[in-house]
Amino acid sequence: MTTAHRPTFDPARGKSNTQAAGSISHTRSLPSHTKLKYRYARISTNTDAMRKTLLENEGGLKQAATKLVAEQQQAETQVQDSEKELSDEVKAKIIEENRDDDDSGSDDEESDSDDSDSDSDDEDELLRIELERIKQERAQAKAREEERLALEEAKAREEQVAFGNPLMNPVAIKRKWNEDVVFRNQTKQARKEDSYVNDLIRSDFHRKFMNRYVR
């Protein structure tokens, strides 16, 4: 590309010029870009906000699941402790009754040995039945608690799946400014049906021509 059309800002000098080479420089010869350009701070977009919301929802779901697991473990521990305490109480009661029987008179033992044995057997049987009944009640309560926790966890999971993803949430479509205009779409015409026929005799033009000039 030629530069003949450009003006000469720095004309050529002959050999008679005694000035030192490079002592005079034009403004255009000086460096113009003396500062570095830095990147601007990133502008937050809808994608960033959506990502942040999803991360927060995920963290909330994890916390809820951890809380449910902790409650379930605590309930199991309480049931085990109560069963252990109950069994200890039953054992202590049996030992105390046996001790009372041993402290009774020797004469009574000899005369009523058969009756006391039968009574102790009956009491042991009743205690055993009572213990089994209490264990069944504890097991039923534990099963109900586990079922309740499972239902709550499933409900929380369904809500997270339904409302955690912003893309699946119902979106309210903004109405246009001319939605409620009184004379809206007046110039809009109904589409006419295509009456084209690939036959000159049965075409609309031929029929109009015959009706106008022949009949």
Curated annotation (Swiss-Prot):
Residues 81-97 have a biased composition (Basic and acidic residues). One of its GO terms (cellular component) is post-mRNA release spliceosomal complex. The keyword Nucleus applies. Residues 60-162 form a coiled coil. It is found in: Nucleus. Residues 15-32 have a biased composition (Polar residues). One of its GO terms (biological process) is mRNA cis splicing, via spliceosome. Keywords: Coiled coil, mRNA processing, mRNA splicing, Nucleus, Spliceosome. Transmembrane segments: none annotated. Residues 1-34, 72-125 are annotated as: Disordered. Its main location: nucleus. GO terms for molecular function: RNA binding. Residues 98-125 have a biased composition (Acidic residues). Involved in pre-mRNA splicing. Associated with the spliceosome. Belongs to the CWC15 family. This is Pre-mRNA-splicing factor CWC15. It comes from Yarrowia lipolytica (strain CLIB 122 / E 150).
